[in-house]
Design a protein with these regions (language model features):
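N-terminal phosphate-binding or glycine-rich loops at protein starts, especially the Walker A/P-loop
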Residues: 1-3
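Phosphate/nucleotide-donor binding subsite
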Residues: 10-51
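Short glycine/serine/threonine-rich phosphate/pyrophosphate-binding segments
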Residues: 36-39, 60-67
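Short, acidic/small-residue loops that bind anionic groups at enzyme active sites
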Residues: 66-98, 157-166
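Acidic/polar active-site rim loop that often engages polyanionic ligands
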Residues: 89-102, 128-136
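Glycine-rich phosphate/diphosphate-binding loop of Rossmann-like nucleotide-binding domains
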Residues: 106-166
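Conserved small/polar residues in nucleotide/adenosyl-binding loops
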Residues: 170-178
């Protein structure tokens, strides 16, 4: 089946290139493959406002490096985060980071909560999102020091943009209980 049979061609453009970033490339090797790779061209299309989003099934590390080289970061945000929409019985959950960052500080996790809540609100403007930390358990005392510190900060912080719902051990029942970021 061809894409054009499923999606109206006015919504996409295919730009061919023979230069690829391999899944076995390190993030830096991928970025060094240059400005003619499909990933670089896709990110460049967002920078030039020819596209609003990039969807990639390619090398995740290279995607983050190429994006960081080409796109401006939001002021005071140190790390980018991948996001995904996960369906649940009550709707959708927005999940950030998705394992893209091996190590995060509590500041990074708080930044992710703000970015995730903002994304959720842009998709569902009539709902106030619930933010939860994915953790090894739902109890406040579980997790490493970074998770515990982040929990305390988010729990004490009054946000007009979202409700803090604590820690979440991700199960299908937990996801269905609330629409969460």
């Amino acid at each position: 089946r061809q894409i054009k049979n499923r999606i109206d061609s006015k919504f996409y453009e295919i730009i061919h290139t023979d230069i690829i970033i391999k899944s076995t490339d390190s993030p830096l090797e991928g970025a060094k493959r240059g400005k003619e790779t499909s990933m670089w061209l896709a990110i460049q299309s967002v920078k030039e406002k020819k596209a609003g989003i990039v969807i990639s099934a390619g090398n995740t590390g290279a995607l983050l490096v190429v994006a960081k080289l080409n796109l401006k970061m939001i002021e005071n945000i140190d790390k980018p985060a991948l996001s995904a929409l996960w369906p649940n019985k009550k709707g959708m959950s927005v999940v950030l980071d998705l394992g893209a960052n091996i190590e995060c500080s509590s500041k990074n996790l708080i930044d992710f909560s703000i970015m995730g809540a903002s994304l959720y609100t842009s998709l569902y403007p009539d709902e106030k999102p619930n933010v939860a930390l994915l953790n090894i358990g739902s109890e406040e005392l579980k997790g490493n020091e970074t998770i515990k510190e982040t929990y305390q900060i988010l729990n004490e912080k009054n946000s007009l943009n979202y409700n803090f719902a604590g820690c979440l051990l991700y199960t299908s029942d937990a996801a269905d209980e609330h629409r969460r970021v």
